[in-house]
Amino acid sequence: MNKTDVIVIGAGVVGAATARELSRYNLNVLVLEAGSDVAEGASKANSAIVHAGFDAKPGTNKAKFNVAGNRMFEDVCRELKVPFKRNGSLVLAFGEEEEKALEDLKAKAEQNGVPVEIIDQAELRKREPRVSEAATKALWAPTGGICCPYELTFRYAENAAANGVEFAFDAKVVEVKSKSKLKLRVEGEGEGEGWVVKTADGREFEAKAIVNCAGIHSDELNNQVSKTKYNIEARRGEYLMLDKDEDGTFAATMFQVPSKMGKGILVSPTVDGTVIVGPTAEDIGDKEDKATTYEGLEKVKEGAMRTYPALPLGKVITEFSGLRAHETTKGDFVLGEVSDAPGFFNALGVESPGLTSAPALGLYLAGEVASKLGASKKNEAIISKDVSYWPKTREMEPEELAALVEKDPSFGRVICRCEEVTEGEIRAAIRARVGARTLDGIKRRTRSGMGRCQGGFCTPRLIEILAAELGVAPEKFLLSRKTAPKELREEAAARLVSAKAQVEDYDVIVVGAGPAGLAAACAAKDNGANKVLCIERDDAPGGILQQCIHNGFGLHRFSEELTGPEYAQRWVDMAKERGVEIVCGTMVLKVDPTRITAMSPRGGLKSYRTKSVVLAMGCRERPRGALMTPGTRPAGVYTAGTVQRLVNMDGIMPGKKVVILGSGDIGLIMARRLTFSGAKVLACIEIMKKSSGLMRNVVQCLNDYDIPLLLSHTVTDVEGREHVTGVKVAKVDDNLKPIPGTEMHFDCDTLVLSCGLIPENELTKKAGIEMDPKTRGPKVDPKTMATSVPGIFAGGNVVRVYDLVDWVSRDSEIAGKSAALYAKGL
């Protein structure tokens, strides 16, 4: 039996904060977590708000610890290097009745010691011009803030581990008993002093004290040891997340007047630059049901539009839900030592404002435990402040970044293009003391896969890195979010030194070396450009066609039918024949008409001077979040392009029973490819009245293999907790709304999304180029492919999504010719 002084059950933000505070004492501390990582429960799925404290009932634990935690938050985040912003919060009133509620909130705030003021409509509109004109007044709370809850949890755990706290994951506690009931006697100790904890896999641990931070399951543990029973109801909240394009929509967190169920639908900026919308509040019986629902997401949209009538649903990048631990008998945080269970300490029913309260709760609980055990504090000089912090390259100055890449080239290899996360950051996240063991773990530590494509591009690379670092077969990361536990490893922080970026000169620089970029480069050369450079973020030129092993390309451009790799190679050869320089594995960070800034693991940070630029970054797939498909969030949901890469390039089959949502060409082609590889494609589901793909692909990829195409249907629910087990499908009406009573069910292990492509235009927007809201690409002159910024041209799918790659090449040649003429001053 493993013995320790203190066991903390649960590695959410409260458990991690408590562990960190306990690490300041001369105690042996073990954290047992049911999930495979920290922040697996409410700490990963909440509003990320640091509440001011005006809403909590005066005199309650919620009020006391909310205010105390808020005051500690800034210092804690600075110590742990966690992003935090005190942006303030506004509670909106719509009419006289709700204005009275603001007065009640103001009175509560004054009793709780929270500074607030009520502002009129004119002042509200001055501060927040985009707020609804129906809002008549607002309560302003300047001490409200925003943070990153999962990063805070991880950094708490990292600092605790640096001070000797041990963490055991996949360790669900199923039984807690006092030694007195087990009639255990340990030499040198009295009978009944301490506790024995048993996990689901049969492991047993012995401790002098237990801290119950088990979230929605904390009532179950309390009720095993105490006559005082509590009941926790899982309260589900559903959210939408908007793209970083919406950053700056509101400065403050925008609340509505709260109800007995919660603080209502909010619209708030995040520290990461996105906008969060939600949550709903629904009491459910299943403590594991984190599925989103059609009805819930509709409520989020409806509620948010009350605050923000212009809510841009086209900018939704993901949807998710979280479960709050709502205690029904007391309605407050239940804290401290249980009177009839000495040595057992509760942090029970910690719902909102639990995140805000976490620093104060950790301090309080650790103090209570230390006092009970008579533990002394460690010498302050030996307490580690290290949190295994690694550089965030997207936030670094150019000279600083260049020096880092020179020292460690992996920090120059961008894996996640949306969030500009490098291989070095990902490997550091895995190698941390409390390191990432899953795709979700990497996501929460680095933001890889959290951007607008939601992992559509980077997932295969992340799997490759995880598998190499952890010695686990890549397939395991497709089957489940959990992997076998591995010993924690330590890594020293990289030291940064000064260096200067290198500069080279060109006539035309093309961003992207897919068919569009290569065609533009060839045309530039053919029209008199002397030095032409293609910069490609992938490790080889050719773009997405390298994974399109089917034929059907080139009939219009080369008068012969080619496979994707053959078509790409044709352009690669033509570019090389003309003397076009191609640099791969290089991520462009900034575009100006006369200068390109890029980064690579080999060349570090480089600056290229140029006379003109062609943008040819291609497009990306619409992820599940943008579709707002309800259901759970298990492994087994992939975009068609991701499946195409896994099967065609990595030799990995994602599943055996497949449903395809959407009838885009990639999805249709993958239906045939998966069938060839031994999978059973059950159906292709299309919400519109006709397929969005080419008719020849419908015939050759579906009809020829007896795969049904269900038009005017959509997926209404994704089932499965760890991995997809099935989907529900329903007919839709003329407004694309599901028709009740038309549902059908498919047992499947994989859902493939083929629901359209979107031009990849992050660099375009950064360059200040005018965008076309219809195509979601840059506005261009069709005769020259010139953008609104002189000297910058664009070609291919970055402008609009084409049906055929031949037309991509054709229009990109126009862009390349125009760029060459511009460079010559013509």
List PLM regions with ranges.
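Helix-loop-beta segment of a Rossmann-like dinucleotide-binding subdomain
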Residues: 83-91, 105, 125-163, 194-197, ...
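C-terminal catalytic lobe of FAD-dependent flavoproteins
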Residues: 262, 271-272, 283, 288-414, ...
